[in-house]
């Protein structure tokens, strides 16, 4: 977990939210995680757990509790809508159970090669998500600006679009991941770019985070 604390110190000034995969932290303990969350809050960062919930509402509500108590510290979570809109109710109920509020980002598109989130499915996700107050926004495909333009048109201005699949080095990554440039993603309609290995695997994460922030902010100003 030392690396996570280091990230807050080195990239915190250049980001708005810190994306986590809590179940990938090998040395996780409740005590250390609590300290980590406190450090993120002190740095004025949202904690974005990229859990991609997909089960029915009741199970998702229980998963938000569970070993990691995601409901107790996450500000945002991701979810598929394949099981129906009740999943959003379940996730929101989990936050309510502990007196907190949070937002759900629904996966409307994905950037991985061969994914099954086709346009007809995307349209249904957007329609259901726009009508639900518990939906903060949507996940779009940052590697394909032409898809993002269509998503932006469908979503309108009432919800945000966050996009993974962006990298300053455009191309293909590991295990089917694809990358587009953050500027292109923002110009196409993204409100926030999600960067993982492009920052935390860099030789100088702080400099890279600042570079992504500048590229995306400049694009937003030009949009």
Where are each of the predicted segments found?
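A broadly conserved detector of short glycine/acidic/proline-rich loop/turn motifs that flank catalytic sites
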Residues: 110, 185, 199
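Conserved anion-binding
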Residues: 54-149, 154-159, 169-171
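Substrate-binding cleft of secreted/luminal carbohydrate-active enzymes
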Residues: 190-193
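Conserved N-terminal beta1-alpha1 strand-loop-helix module at the mouth
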Residues: 1-48, 55, 116-137, 143, ...
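Structural beta-sheet core signal
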Residues: 49, 105-106, 163
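Conserved, mostly hydrophobic/aromatic
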Residues: 18, 50, 77, 151, ...
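Glycine-rich beta-strand-to-loop/alpha-helix junction loops that act as flexible
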Residues: 21, 163-165, 195-198
């Amino acid at each position: 977990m030392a690396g996570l604390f280091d990230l807050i110190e080195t990239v915190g000034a250049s980001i708005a939210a810190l994306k986590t995969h809590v179940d990938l932290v090998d040395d996780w303990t409740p005590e250390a995680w609590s300290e980590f969350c406190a450090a993120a809050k002190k740095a004025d960062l949202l904690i974005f757990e990229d859990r991609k919930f997909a089960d029915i509402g009741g199970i998702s509500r229980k998963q938000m509790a569970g070993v990691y108590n995601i409901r107790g510290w996450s500000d945002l979570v991701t979810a598929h809508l394949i099981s129906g809109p009740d999943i959003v109710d379940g996730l929101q109920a989990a936050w309510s159970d502990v007196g907190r509020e949070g937002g759900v980002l629904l996966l409307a598109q994905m950037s991985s090669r061969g994914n099954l989130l086709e346009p007809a499915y995307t349209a249904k996700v957007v329609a259901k998500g726009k009508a639900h107050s518990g939906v903060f926004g949507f996940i779009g495909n940052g590697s394909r600006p032409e898809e993002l333009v269509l998503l932006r048109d469908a979503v309108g201005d009432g919800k945000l679009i966050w996009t993974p699949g962006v990298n300053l080095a455009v191309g293909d990554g590991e295990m089917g991941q694809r990358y587009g440039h953050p500027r292109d993603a923002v110009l196409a309609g993204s409100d926030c770019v999600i960067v993982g290995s492009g920052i935390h695997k860099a030789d100088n994460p702080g400099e890279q985070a600042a570079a992504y922030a500048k590229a995306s902010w400049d694009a937003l100003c030009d949009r």
